[in-house]
Amino acid sequence: HFAELSSSEINATELVAMLIGMGNSIKEGIDYVQNNVKGSCSMLVLTDHAIYAARDKFGRTPISIGKNDKGYVCASESSSYANLGYSFVRDLGPGEIVQMSADGVREVTPPGCRKQVCSFLWVYYGYPSAWYEGINVEDARYESGAAMARHDADLEIDYAAGIPDSG
């Protein structure tokens, strides 16, 4: 369980950690958080022997798994894997929990069927080379622009410009 807080104030991460600690196991604690916290909460939980990766129960925020010959990795953006020498394996499904250890990846909780992915992943948050749910961010942005151009083809427009990347 979790030993201490960073200060006299509680932040969201520490609150989730304390809620996980209320379970009799990491899985029970994650289930408790996923079923009682309003909103989306995907997480990675580090233990002495494993990393648990849990995607929020509606699949709004992504987590994917990568692999190389030395082991596994997980992240919210699979585009980071190539720079680290890993290849993409798969996305976690809504509510899915996996345990990654030296022995491999083990499914702890299977994915649910209800998915409500955040569309801002493709429109705003995602790095252009990232892929979410099998759809490339840059391609989605170009296709969205093309669809808007077709929709507004009969309007007299002087100029159209994309929204610059943020951050």
Feature-to-residue mapping (PLM):
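Carboxylate/His-rich catalytic cores and anion/metal-binding grooves
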Residues: G167
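Conserved short alpha-helical segments that host acidic/polar catalytic motifs at enzyme active sites
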Residues: H1-P94, Q99-P164
